């Protein structure tokens, strides 16, 4: 059985098409029954449906793939809360040791083979043309950074991911080492781990992917097909109790506070001015009354003084009159005595 290098490269380096839809199985009932009978391999069918038409005989070779019987394959049972019904073939461990990789590489050497692994990767990328219109899920922007110079895999192993709501941040550049994890960002949450010996496919449910997308705000990952999730992220129109005030509304508020606080000050000042004015008026009235009373007393005293002065004058005249009278009487008495 021969496998073209272009097909294997498309599976390794291209956007990974094996996404699980938690709303329903990827296979119909006829395909599931054929899987149970062991007469048809869904892996070969899915691989052939996603293989690029690179050369003329590549599709025929890929359609003629026959994997080992299902009784020889190592099947791992899913956990109790498996959300992928009908996807048991994804947990099967496929052994590729029986494939003659040298002959596969030699089958693609009919054309001018690239001289370096980078040229080979560029050739494989240029020949890939996937038809994603037939997929059950909506088209999403898939990005898989290419920075690995690894040999062809000898073993394909798929494991279900434990329910951990975390998505690794998108790597800047994948270093060239023996084991590198390359995350694939799409709604089904498939993460690939490439190594020289095997390929590990890790699947997460869509609900956990949405939760991880909510928690991982720094990575900038967003899910387009979740209206409920988008409605939760919409900002509430109700103002928060400790939110910062709007800068446009703050000047009006400040002016309002200023006028409301200035009005009592002006009223208090006016009230104080009126109090001072009334106090001054009362003081002037009091002083006027006191002055008038003093003037009246002075006038009365002056009147009494005039009366007393007049009495004194009259008394002084009477006294003078009496003196004169006494003098005349003495003189008259002396005249009589002399006679």
Swiss-Prot record:
The keyword Acyltransferase does not apply. Residues 266-329 form the bZIP domain. SUPFAM superfamilies: Leucine zipper domain. Its main location: nucleus. It holds the Pfam family bZIP_1. GO terms for molecular function: cAMP response element binding protein binding; DNA-binding transcription activator activity, RNA polymerase II-specific; DNA-binding transcription factor activity; protein heterodimerization activity; RNA polymerase II transcription regulatory region sequence-specific DNA binding. CDD domains: bZIP_ATF4. It comes from the Eukaryota. Residues 231-247, 300-313 have a biased composition (Basic and acidic residues). Residues 162-173 have a biased composition (Pro residues). Keywords: Activator, Biological rhythms, DNA-binding, Nucleus, Repressor, Transcription, Transcription regulation. Residues 35-55, 211-226 have a biased composition (Low complexity). Residues 294-322 are annotated as: Leucine-zipper. Transcription factor that binds the cAMP response element (CRE) (consensus: 5'-GTGACGT[AC][AG]-3') and displays two biological functions, as regulator of metabolic and redox processes under normal cellular conditions, and as master transcription factor during integrated stress response (ISR). Binds to asymmetric CRE's as a heterodimer and to palindromic CRE's as a homodimer. Core effector of the ISR, which is required for adaptation to various stress such as endoplasmic reticulum (ER) stress, amino acid starvation, mitochondrial stress or oxidative stress. PANTHER family: ACTIVATING TRANSCRIPTION FACTOR ATF 4/5, CYCLIC AMP-DEPENDENT TRANSCRIPTION FACTOR ATF-4. Belongs to the bZIP family. This is Cyclic AMP-dependent transcription factor ATF-4. It comes from Danio rerio (Zebrafish). The lineage of its organism: Eukaryota, Metazoa, Chordata, Craniata, Vertebrata. The gene is atf4.
């Amino acid at each position: 059985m021969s496998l073209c290098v272009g097909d294997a490269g498309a599976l390794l380096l291209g956007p990974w098409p094996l996404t699980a839809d938690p709303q329903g199985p990827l296979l119909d009932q006829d395909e599931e029954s054929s899987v149970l009978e062991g007469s048809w391999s869904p892996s070969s069918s899915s691989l052939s449906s996603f293989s690029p038409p690179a050369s003329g005989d590549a599709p025929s070779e890929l359609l003629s793939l026959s994997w080992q019987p299902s009784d020889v394959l190592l099947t791992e049972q899913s956990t109790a809360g498996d959300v992928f019904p009908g996807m048991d073939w994804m947990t099967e461990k496929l052994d590729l040791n029986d494939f003659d990789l040298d002959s596969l590489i030699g089958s693609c050497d009919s054309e001018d083979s690239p001289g370096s692994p980078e040229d080979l990767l560029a050739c494989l990328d240029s020949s890939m043309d996937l038809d994603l219109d037939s997929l059950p899920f909506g088209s999403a922007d898939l990005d898989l950074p290419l920075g690995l110079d690894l040999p062809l895999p000898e073993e394909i192993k798929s494991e279900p991911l434990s329910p951990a709501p975390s998505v690794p941040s998108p790597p800047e550049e994948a270093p060239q080492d023996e084991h590198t994890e390359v995350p694939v960002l799409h709604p089904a949450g498939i993460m690939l781990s490439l190594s020289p010996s095997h390929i590990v496919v890790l699947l997460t449910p869509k609900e956990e992917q949405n939760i991880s997308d909510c928690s991982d705000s720094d990575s900038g990952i967003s899910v387009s097909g979740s209206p409920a999730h988008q409605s939760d992220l919409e900002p509430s129109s109700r103002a928060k109790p400790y939110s910062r005030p709007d800068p446009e509304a703050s000047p009006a508020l400040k002016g309002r506070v200023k006028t409301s606080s200035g009005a009592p000050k002006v009223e208090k000042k006016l009230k104080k001015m009126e109090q001072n004015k009334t106090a001054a008026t009362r003081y002037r009235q009091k002083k006027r009354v006191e002055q008038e009373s003093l003037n009246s007393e002075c006038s009365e005293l002056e009147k009494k003084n005039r009366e007393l002065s007049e009495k004194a004058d009259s008394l002084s005249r009477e006294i003078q009159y009496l003196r004169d009278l006494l003098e005349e009487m003495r003189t008259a008495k002396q005249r009589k005595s002399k006679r």
